């Protein structure tokens, strides 16, 4: 059986990530070459030996001294090796990568942290991270939604709804002329778009739900929450006013741990019955659950 669309997306992204970033732990430093070998020194050489060897090789391969193109390429490698080994921090990281080549991700992170960490603006890094995460989040949401829609469209209930809507639109008359198959297919697509598909757990993707957008709107959200809470305290704690229908519904829904969309799908009579029970009060809620347990046992 083929994996679901969402899993295939995730697998493809993981493989792409691995293909881009996973490589030899030491290759990120001097490529396929050994940094010490490029400078002609041993791994335990001191800083003076490394510096002396670099200047000696510079006299032979520097572009100003040697115009040969191959020598120019070699000098670039030598200069790179010297930049890595002259600094105690990067040299220690390189030595660790040699000793622990299996720790690919750690060694790679250490390298780029040392190379770019001090040059990067934390704000730019944060923005970039939010953009990347939001992009992945949106792609995942779209994949999940399309997969859920495709699943629903294969159910008998959906097909019956579509057939009923088609009969209503055409008056029960089918087109048997040439090309009717294409016309019927187009009509089905139009009717399918008219059907309101409410799929729990796979709502239509919205930019307002993205992590980056929520982060940008965080100050507004906090202010809005503080205003709402202050109004609640003033109205119901200080003035002791009776709960409005909306607020009583909110308290009831929160007491029963019912999601907003599930509450919206309840009929008005059921909502009114639950609100009148004042389930936000502990004793009333306990009595309600006790009644539900008794009712469940009775039905068995």
Swiss-Prot record:
Induction: Not induced by tunicamycin. It is a multi-pass membrane protein. Residues 28-122, 228-300 are lumenal. Keywords: Chaperone, Endoplasmic reticulum, Glycoprotein, Membrane, Signal, Transmembrane, Transmembrane helix. Expressed in leaves, flower buds and flowers. The lineage of its organism: Eukaryota, Viridiplantae, Streptophyta, Embryophyta, Tracheophyta. The chain crosses the membrane at residues 123-143, 207-227. It is found in: Endoplasmic reticulum membrane. This is Chaperone protein dnaJ 50. May play a role in protein folding in the endoplasmic reticulum. Glycans are attached at residues 46, 88. InterPro entries: DnaJ_domain (IPR001623), DnaJ_domain_CS (IPR018253), DNAJC25-like (IPR044632), J_dom_sf (IPR036869). The keyword Zinc-finger does not apply. PROSITE patterns: DNAJ_1, DNAJ_2. CDD domains: DnaJ.
